[in-house]
């Protein structure tokens, strides 16, 4: 880290302080195409379905993502139900969110971020090991706009982390 350009320290928020280090890295050299591709299809039930053109192998990643989502949605709903019941007993009509619920949302966000990082890191290592120089991902711009697939499917679809 010889080329540190900037350090940013943000004050504590929710008990955590944020430190951002901006540094300069050397631009890696561009490798020429070798005709070996990895295509990635993003979906609802499987986060990523990948196809390796070199050996014809297909693999599916992302079922754990749905499991994480399901667990946290159930836990948040349970805690919210208890919290709202307690608040309505006190006569509070529109209760604020509790610290416990906020902590669960943060925990969910961190778990999803961690899982996506591990998944993409695994894909990068696979590409490096198999000498894949080009990864093709389907065009996902405007994928969520003006889509109506029913109430339940829309909820799942709009909850997917396509912007990451």
Regions found by a protein language model. Give the residues of each.
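Positively charged, helix-rich recognition surfaces that bind polyanionic ligands
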Residues: 3, 13-164
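An N-terminal domain-cap segment
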Residues: 2-8
């Amino acid at each position: 880290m010889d080329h540190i350009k900037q350090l940013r320290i943000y004050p504590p928020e929710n008990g955590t302080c944020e430190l951002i280090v901006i540094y300069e890295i050397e631009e890696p050299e561009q490798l020429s195409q070798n005709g070996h591709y990895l295509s990635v299809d993003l979906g609802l039930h499987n986060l990523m379905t990948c196809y390796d053109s070199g050996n014809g192998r297909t693999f599916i990643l992302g079922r754990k993502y749905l499991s994480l989502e399901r667990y946290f949605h159930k836990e948040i709903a349970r805690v919210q139900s208890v919290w709202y019941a307690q608040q309505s007993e006190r006569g509070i009509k529109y209760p604020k969110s509790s610290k416990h619920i906020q902590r669960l949302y943060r925990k969910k966000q961190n778990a999803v971020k961690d899982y996506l990082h591990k998944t993409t890191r695994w894909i990068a290592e696979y590409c490096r090991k198999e000498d894949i120089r080009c990864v093709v991902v389907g065009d996902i711009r405007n994928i969520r706009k003006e889509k109506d697939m029913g109430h339940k499917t829309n909820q799942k679809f709009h909850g997917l982390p396509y912007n990451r």
